[in-house]
Amino acid sequence: MNKKISAAFIAAILIIPTTANAALKTEVNVSKPTVVVIDTGLDTSIPMFSGRIAQEVCILDWNTCPNGKNFMEGPGASVIPSKFINKNGFDHGTQMTSILLGNNSDINVVFIRIVGNTATGSRQIITELPIVNALNWAFNNKDKYNVQAVTMSQGNHNLFPGKDYCPKTVSTQNQIKRLISVGIPTFLPAGNGRDYKRIDWPACIDDSVSIGAATDYDEIPIWANVDVLKTDFYALGQWDATIPGNEIKSAVGSSVSVQIAAAKWLEIKKNKPSLSYSDIYDLMSKTSTVIANPTGLTGKLMNVTAALNG
C-alpha cells in the first residue's frame, strides 16, 4: 500500500529552537508493562521520559535511520536531527509519548520510529511495510519488554467509496490479529476529517481497537470521523503535550485519544489482572457512556471509573 501516512491529529504547534536529543542514561524498571509507541521520532532528552524508555527502534522504507540503514535498534534509534524535529510533524512522536506517560505513571515505552527524513528535513513517503515490520517487532519482543499494548497515532484517509471502504491490507491485519492472540491490543486513531461514514486506515481494520476523539464535555466533536460500526471507543481528544525542547503545547485530535485510551486500558488491566483481552474489551464496552456528535451519531466513551467498579 504505497500511500503516504499523515499524522492524525490537530495541534497548535510553535516552531521553537531545539535542544540536542541526548538519550537519558537511566535504568528502566523492566517489570512494568510496556507500550510500543509507533510514530515519527522522539526527543529522548525530555525529563519526563527519564527511566521510562525501555528501547528505541527505527524501521523505515529508506536507509535513513541514524545508522544509515533502514533498521536500527538501541539508544539513538528514534532520534530525529534537532534542526528538523520541530518541523513537518516530526515532533508528533514526542507529543504522543508524553500524553501516554502523562496518563499512566506505571508503564514504560518502546518507541519505534517509522517516519524518515530527507537531507533537507522533509518527511519521506511511508508504505505499509514499516508498519507491518513494527507490529512484527512488537510481537517478537513482547516477552523481553513485557509488551501489553501497541499504539500508532498515525493514519490516512485514502479510502474506497461505499460501505466496504477499508483497504484490504492483509499483512497489517494479520499482525494485529497475532498480537490479539497473545492479549495485546493495537490502538489506532479514527481521524479528524469530518467524515461521518468512514474512519482512517488502519483504524478501519476490524481487529484494531479504533479510537475516536471526545471533548471534555463528553461529546463527539464536529470534526471527528465517525463510523458507528467500526469505531470501538472514544476517549478525551485534548491534552497538554510536551514537544521537543521540553515546551508544552495543546494537542487535539484522535491521536491524543489513542494514547489516553491505551493508558486507561492498562490501568484496568493492572487493577483486574485476571481479565483477558476479550474480558477487558467487553468490560469497557459494557461500562462505557453513550455520547453523540452534532448530527446524532453515537459512540462509546471509555469510563474507567465505571470499569474499575464493574
Provide a role label for each language-model segment.
Residues A23-N108, G116-T118, P130-N133, N140-N146, ...:
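Active-site core segment of subtilase-fold serine proteases
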Residues A23, Y145-Q154, D207-S210, I222, ...:
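C-terminal subdomain of the subtilisin-like protease fold in secreted/lumenal serine endopeptidases
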Residues T18-A22:
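Sec/Tat signal peptide C-region and signal peptidase I cleavage site
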Residues V115-I205, Y217, N246-Q259, T295-G296:
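Substrate-binding/access-modulating region of protease and related hydrolase catalytic domains
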Residues F9-P17:
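Bacterial N-terminal signal peptides
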Residues T34-I38, N108-R113, N146-S153, P185-P189, ...:
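Structural recognition of the beta-strand scaffold that forms the well-ordered cores
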Residues P33, D39, I59, D200-K270, ...:
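Extracellular S/T/G-rich loop segment that most often corresponds to the catalytic His/Ser-adjacent loop
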Residues N2-F9:
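Sec-dependent signal peptide recognition
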